[in-house]
Amino acid sequence: MTREEWTRDLILTGYVDERGAYTISNIKSAPNGEFGMAMLCVKGEELSIYDTDFSAKPGRLMYTIRLPEITDVRLSTFALHPTLKFTYQNFRWSFMAGFGKKLPISELFASLAGAKTR
């Protein structure tokens, strides 16, 4: 399945909106100590974080984060170490991998970083 087909499927099943902003990433820091692979999906003003595995299909919903409430966004699309970090409800979240320069989710967080970086 191509990335375009996968994006269309996620839109049709309601995981993401028409922007197609999603990625598979590794959780480095989450409030309850979770780690490992996760699927990050953006729909409206919410970032949903789903458990996933190598099938790359969304599993159990772990967190829902309101995008307007995140602060101190840091995004690196450097090929060897792409990372996303932000603060939400006094916790510093961290994810590694899955943030290529031209991906819709990277563009979305880059715009948030420009608007909200302290």
In which residue ranges do the predicted regions lie?
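Short acidic DE-rich linear segments
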Residues: 117-118
